[in-house]
Amino acid sequence: MANVTIIGAQWGDEGKGKVVDWLASRADVVVRFQGGHNAGHTLVVGNQTYKLSLLPSGLVRGKLGVIGNGVVVDPVALLAEIGRVREQGLNVTPETLRIADNAPLILPLHAALDAAREAARGARRIGTTGRGIGPAYEDKVARRAIRICDLAEPETLDWRLDELLLHHNTLLAGLGAPTFGKAELMDQLLALAPQILPFAEPVWERLAEAKKSGARILFEGAQAVMLDVDHGTYPFVTSSNTVSGQIAAGAGVGPDAAGRVLGIAKAYSTRVGSGPFPTEQDNETGRLLGERGHEFGTVTGRARRCGWFDAALVRQAVKVGGIQGLALTKLDVLDGMTTLQIGVGYRIGGETLPHLPPGAAAQAKAEPVYETIEGWSGSTRGARSYADLPAQAIKYVRRIEELVECPVTLLSTSPERDDTILMQDPFAD
């Protein structure tokens, strides 16, 4: 059976939740392989609306959920999220959710350091969610992280906490922030251990068995390619790799397990927080897109910045992310707009570039090169076949395919799960 990997092709918030939910109903296993509880999905199933940040989306469809070792896990946030969905009738148990025993933990000191650093940056703040994701990844790379498996070994926790506090308390004190005590953290971790450890296992074994048995595996990415720590708009990025290649390291599977890679992109562009956004419309057009698209972050509640579709940016995401097909969402938001613009490149100091350069100063100076395309007066909302779309809307989609050098294989025309036009089944063998 074919596997599918879903990743964002812009700066996140592309509508991955709906597409993941739609595909999860046909998968056997749904796997998170990077990120933490800093990105959210909103899923509507029947009369229930689920807001997930850490749990794999497939759980709401009764599928096995797996959190891989590439995810940084806040145990308090995880248990709170499990509690919320249980109150909604979703029974999350160790039989339905498995977590990599070597996944790093996010502790309260990580969030404290995150907040203290952002405050110290002032006008140069990155715009993190303040949930400790970055500091937790730093500890993983520096070999001082506390991992889920350590919860079973108090003697290991003892010396790991010494190393962790030496580093973090030094930084916190230097930033004028309160420091942490070892005894309190130890008590918290020992209290969490019996609640977290029943979910833990070497998930690479389970995924190897799933692959061997022919199960369909859906790998669920968080954030998006242009927030990738290597390939995104650095330093205004997340702290993990978000491209499809990350599933091998972040889930403990071989690179061939990715299967078909589906990138998700809105029919326009949005971004939360700081960072370059060449096609941003800080005007009435941007406000109109935000109002129509209900552009507020699931996790932060922050209003998203809005602008025209940036084909040069998405083309870059297609190439570095290994994207083989594009799911285009929120096409209906553009209904009734007489003229549309598509970013096709960037102008920097008289030079035109087909891609966004890596340098922060160059990115800040980048001015978009636009191609103008006629809009449409009819409605695309709720369309479930190409025959239901206005001719000009089809032309818009076709032009995007040409510019990003990737076929649009799925179109979403409303938040409703079934308002989807499928041109190519990503699970097809």
Curated annotation (Swiss-Prot):
Its EC number is 6.3.4.4. SUPFAM superfamilies: P-loop containing nucleoside triphosphate hydrolases. Keywords: Cytoplasm, GTP-binding, Ligase, Magnesium, Metal-binding, Nucleotide-binding, Purine biosynthesis. Binds 1 Mg(2+) ion per subunit. Substrate binds at residues 298-304. Its main location: cytoplasm. GO terms for molecular function: adenylosuccinate synthase activity; GTP binding; magnesium ion binding. It is found in: Cytoplasm. GTP binds at residues 12-18, 40-42, 304, 330-332, 412-414. Belongs to the adenylosuccinate synthetase family. Homodimer. This is Adenylosuccinate synthetase. It comes from Acidiphilium cryptum (strain JF-5).
